[in-house]
Amino acid sequence: MKKPQKPKDTKELLKKHHSEIFKLTKDEKVMEFVRKCNKEYVHWDQLRYKKIPNDIPPEYIWVILKLLRESQYKLFTFGSWTFHYELLDDFQKKLHILDMGTAGRIGSNIDSIASGRERYIISSLMEEAIASSQLEGAVTTRPIAKEMLRLKKKPRNYSEQMIVNGYQTLQKILTMKEKTITPDIILELHKSITKDTLKDKKYEGTFRDNNEVVVADPLEIEKVYYTPPDYKKIPSLIKEFCEFANSDKHDFIHPIIKGMMLHFLIGYIHPFEDGNGRTARTLFYWYVLNKGYWLFEFMAISRILVRSRIKYGLSYLYTETDDNDLTYFLEYNLSTIEEALEDMNTYIIRKQKEQSEALELIKSLKNINLRQAEILKEFLKNSEKMFVVNEIMTIYGVAYDTARNDLLHLTQLGYLEKIKIQKKFVFKLSKKRIIPE
């Protein structure tokens, strides 16, 4: 990934070309182009390649664009840094959708698949753990990783260990979402995320103790994108991070925007030798759940980040190279959340259909409950696959005995077969095929 070009100093440009730039502000065609660029929130590195009306120098357009933005900026000071951001109209729309989703329609839609609620939380946590690990270099496929998590298999390599760590840490987040964040909790989460994956085990759950860490291109190490602050500043920065996360003393910041700021700050502080990205995304989840946005339990945001990982990286670099303008990072992350929400809605529609089919199955088969009907549908979808109790237990979020009793009940009714393979019992669809498809 090529590092974006840093914009020229707008004050210097304005000083040199004041009269030419001022004239352009009276040109409606030019201003229409400027407004379009602002709506898209283009960075200088994008603007300089755009076709500009009347071949006007891009530097002139950039000055007008920056003046327009600066009039709308909100300031945010952290440590010795001053960040700023603009609440674009598009932000307000997306945040409203998320607020309404948490309060109303989407919630009732999820409740309509109540028997699958826990199941979907488990599935989304798996998806998030897999994708978040893939962003950091884990090499595996989703089906293999999901099977490992469902069967609770022991991880065989570095990539699988990353995924197991991520999944277990997200489960931990669900149990501690009411807590206030502290430096010790951040270290605890980092230790959980990085267990048995670091070159030097002593860095699990500890802040870095050197300045050798840089953010660089994984294929071209000499291409450094960003140099984090001195390691000696980390304890005080993390203390300030926790104060910012836990306090509402500042001017109001929408919780989702603030959660994204926390995500960004961990990447910016880079407090750890490794695992900064996974820790940042985990803390984002903690924060929005802590603020009552339970909807995020059902969204695998990192799966969207994986689809556009270059844009994810650029959202950091655009912010850094444009005077710490957080709008780039916020805009990208809100777009990924919107896409994750769309994925969730698609899932709910599919699950409502499957649940309806399961209810029809109950009518035709009798003697089974809704969960058992859904288990049967799972067997029908994977007619050649053999399932073990642990897998059903994980998929449906039930206790071991409940999963075992469901499978034995379906076997007694003749819908499944129980087979012993290498001292372990497995279940498969009955060859009698007496279940209506």
Residue positions per predicted region:
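FIC/Doc superfamily catalytic core
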Residues: M1-D274, R278-E437
